[in-house]
Swiss-Prot record:
Substrates-to-products reaction catalysed: 3-deoxy-alpha-D-manno-oct-2-ulosonate + CTP = CMP-3-deoxy-beta-D-manno-octulosonate + diphosphate
Species whose genome carries this gene: Nitrobacter winogradskyi (strain ATCC 25391 / DSM 10237 / CIP 104748 / NCIMB 11846 / Nb-255)
Principal localisation: cytoplasm
Pathway assigned in UniProt: Nucleotide-sugar biosynthesis; CMP-3-deoxy-D-manno-octulosonate biosynthesis; CMP-3-deoxy-D-manno-octulosonate from 3-deoxy-D-manno-octulosonate and CTP: step 1/1; Bacterial outer membrane biogenesis; lipopolysaccharide biosynthesis
Any one GO CC term of the record: cytosol
Cited function: Activates KDO (a required 8-carbon sugar) for incorporation into bacterial lipopolysaccharide in Gram-negative bacteria.
Keywords: Cytoplasm, Lipopolysaccharide biosynthesis, Nucleotidyltransferase, Transferase
InterPro entries found in the cross-reference section: Cytidylyl_trans, KdsB, Nucleotide-diphossugar_trans
Protein name from the UniProt record: 3-deoxy-manno-octulosonate cytidylyltransferase
HAMAP family named in the record: KdsB (MF_00057)
Record's subcellular location: Cytoplasm
EC number: 2.7.7.38
GO MF: 3-deoxy-manno-octulosonate cytidylyltransferase activity
Length: 254
């Protein structure tokens, strides 16, 4: 049997200002982080673990049968936390692909998680991510919606040129809403972490621009819809309604 060399890591911390204690908020009788964990496990792409600096999060994860790894509290980004967790969980270097899944996607489809791996079939790609087509001007103009700009290289694939909070690209044609889910080659993650923050990254406040400015290749899979993140009380209520209406919280829709 071929050894599975993919690791899904879910960085989680308690520092959200709009929703204090967000990873542990109850959704349908389970902490939000456990819903994300189970959907990652249902994707069936490899080992799954939560990377956290908070013992309460680790306890909640392990109490529900998941794996958690404690990390330092001073990481500047989720990618740094993921890199530390990778080193602790796989010091021998067997893992060659790392998926960084946000801990506030409790209703993400397992199939969406699987799709982020597809661009890495091309050895020239360093990092893979996702985007969905934007259908309203309101979404296109919203600075909280990150737009992915890229050159089409297939029916559902772009080679990333830029990411921005502005409305882009200008003119007629599709625009894409970036989904903050990444798959890294292990060596690409290390290279990314070692790069200094870049000028455009700091101006746009978008970490992925560091990779582009550093000469790394990011490819984007186009998916049908954007997973619902939970950032506000309204988002939380929506997630609760979706979970309540789903046929089974134990076996999420694929």
């Amino acid at each position: 049997m071929t050894e599975n060399r993919t690791l899904v890591l879910i960085p989680a911390r308690m520092a959200a200002t709009r929703l204090p204690g967000k990873p542990l908020l109850d959704i349908g009788g389970l902490p939000m982080i456990v819903h994300v964990l189970r959907r990652a496990e249902a994707a069936g792409i490899g080992r799954v673990a939560v990377a956290t600096d908070t013992s309460d999060i680790a306890t909640a994860v392990t109490a529900h049968g998941g794996e958690a790894i404690m990390t330092r509290a001073d990481h500047p980004s989720g990618s740094d936390r993921v890199f530390e967790a990778l080193g602790k969980l796989d010091p021998e270097g067997r893992i060659d692909t790392v998926v960084n899944l946000q801990g506030d996607f409790p209703t993400i489809r397992p199939g969406t998680i699987r799709e982020v791996l597809q661009p890495l079939a091309d050895n020239a790609v360093d990092i893979a991510t996702l985007a969905a087509e934007i259908h309203t001007e309101e979404e296109a103009a919203n600075p909280n919606v990150v737009k992915a700009v890229g050159s089409p290289i297939g029916p559902r694939r772009l080679r990333a040129l830029y990411f921005t909070r502005a409305t882009a690209p200008h003119g007629e044609g599709p625009r894409y809403h970036h989904v903050g889910l990444y798959a890294y080659r292990r060596e690409a993650l290390q290279r990314f972490i070692e790069l200094p923050p870049s000028p455009l990254e700091q101006q746009e406040r978008l970490e992925q621009l560091r990779a582009l400015e550093g000469g790394m290749r990011i490819d984007i899979m186009i998916v049908d819809d954007v997973p619902r993140g939970v950032d506000t009380a309204t988002d939380l209520e929506t997630a609760r309604q979706i979970i309540a209406c789903s046929a089974s919280g134990e076996h999420p829709a694929r």
